[in-house]
């Protein structure tokens, strides 16, 4: 398992959980954020300094909802793409992919499009905010174009009554036979 976590606030929580659960030999942390370019320095904008917090944005000035994002913390960090990591044999092609990055899911998919058709990839779980229509549509179109079909989408029941998060779902796609 390769876990990509560029946020310094979340890295501490992730590494602690890996250690507590004795997964040090099973999970490798990569602090490099993914996006649609092979490599480059971009801004990582963070909502705050909360450990385990979300609502961060890499390489863009919008948040999970597509609206302008005003970060409380911002710094430059090196990012790369799935295409670059796989083309240079830094990583092996995965069987399963989970993407939950608060607004740039489509950019990460675009940065991995060279390999998405590979038969080794069986399934992709991706969190999408349906109120961010362009990002949701782009993500679904990239996956369909690369031979994935939607199995289901769901979210926590608590999201049903949340004005802020009611349009956020985990979509599960599987590779067509």
Task: Give the label of every model feature segment.
Residues 1-177:
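Phosphate/nucleotide-binding beta-alpha loop and adjacent structural elements of enzyme active sites
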């Amino acid at each position: 398992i390769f876990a990509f976590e560029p946020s310094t606030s979340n890295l501490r929580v992730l590494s602690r959980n890996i250690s507590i659960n004795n997964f040090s030999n099973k999970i490798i942390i990569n602090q490099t954020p993914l996006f649609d370019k092979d490599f480059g320095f971009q801004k990582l904008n963070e909502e705050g300094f909360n450990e385990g917090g979300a609502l961060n944005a890499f390489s863009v000035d919008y948040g999970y909802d597509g609206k302008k994002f005003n970060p409380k913390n911002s710094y430059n960090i090196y990012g790369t793409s799935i295409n670059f990591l796989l083309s240079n044999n830094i990583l092996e092609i995965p069987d399963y992919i989970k993407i939950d990055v608060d607004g740039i899911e489509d950019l990460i998919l675009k940065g991995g499009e060279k390999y998405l058709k590979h038969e080794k990839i069986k399934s992709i779980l991706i969190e999408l905010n349906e109120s961010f229509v362009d990002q949701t549509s782009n993500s679904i179109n990239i996956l369909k174009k690369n031979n994935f079909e939607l199995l289901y989408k769901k979210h926590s029941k608590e999201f049903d009554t949340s004005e802020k998060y009611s349009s956020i779902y985990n979509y599960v796609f599987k590779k067509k036979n």
